[in-house]
Amino acid sequence: MTKVLVLYYSMYGHVETMAKAIAEGAGSVEGVEVTIKRVPELMTDEQAKKAGVKLDQSAPIATPSELADYDAIIFGTPTRFGNMCAQMRNFLDQTGGLWAGGKLINKVGSVFTSTGTQHGGQETTITSFHTNLFHYGMIVVGVPYSCQEMTNMNEITGGTPYGASTLAGGDGSRQPSENEIKIAKCQGVHVAKVAKKQSAS
């Protein structure tokens, strides 16, 4: 059984929604087992409530050491000035032991994101995140253009060859669109298929 982890941080629920879509896509591949987890919050409960953080997320909290248990990891993060959020950065900074032991070498890695605006750093967030995956020795996978929704020019939409993405809007009111959800599912399917082949080799 090929094991895929969808690991994310979501402040207002947009990345959480995308994570569920990616997990659905990955889980549709025969012989693949999918787990959804999230990284810990750095804010106190009081700070999080004041900031409007979505606290009722069902995904359990992950620990850095368990990353080695999976054949593929699909990371989800909102953007912070074109980079990953502090919560994800803090989590990855605790993986030095995994890196030193080569525990993530030849595992499949992929990234998805959410931004507030159309040009809010979707691609830079994903590609800068890839640097970490290269250091781990992971096989980096994005979204192929065989996913038809990638070429949709009829609406403002997220979705890049580097990874799925969504636009939250300046006030967070915009939810992932049908097109963005379909791209997220495509990413899940693609990563799962690559991981299945890799784990069988």
Curated annotation (Swiss-Prot):
Superkingdom per UniProt: Bacteria
Top-rank EC class of the record's enzyme: oxidoreductase
MF-aspect GO terms: flavin adenine dinucleotide binding; FMN binding; NAD binding; NADH:ubiquinone reductase (non-electrogenic) activity; NADP binding; NADPH dehydrogenase (quinone) activity
Binding site for FMN: 10-15, 79-81, 114-120, 135
Keywords on record: Flavoprotein, FMN, NAD, NADP, Nucleotide-binding, Oxidoreductase
Catalytic activity: a quinone + NADH + H(+) = a quinol + NAD(+); a quinone + NADPH + H(+) = a quinol + NADP(+)
Keyword Zinc: no
Needed cofactors: FMN
Signal peptide: none
Cited InterPro entries: Flavodoxin/NO_synth (IPR008254), Flavoprotein-like_sf (IPR029039), Flavoprotein_WrbA-like (IPR010089), FMN_Rdtase-like_dom (IPR005025), NQO (IPR037513)
Coiled coil: none
GO terms for cellular component: membrane
Start and end residues of each Flavodoxin-like domain: 4-191
Residue sites binding NAD(+) per the record: Y12
Residues where substrate binds: W99
EC number from the UniProt entry: 1.6.5.2
Cofactor comment text: Binds 1 FMN per monomer.
Protein family: Belongs to the WrbA family.
PANTHER family per UniProt: FLAVODOXIN-RELATED PROTEIN WRBA-RELATED, FLAVOPROTEIN-LIKE PROTEIN YCP4-RELATED
Protein name: NAD(P)H dehydrogenase (quinone)
Origin species: Hydrogenovibrio crunogenus (strain DSM 25203 / XCL-2)
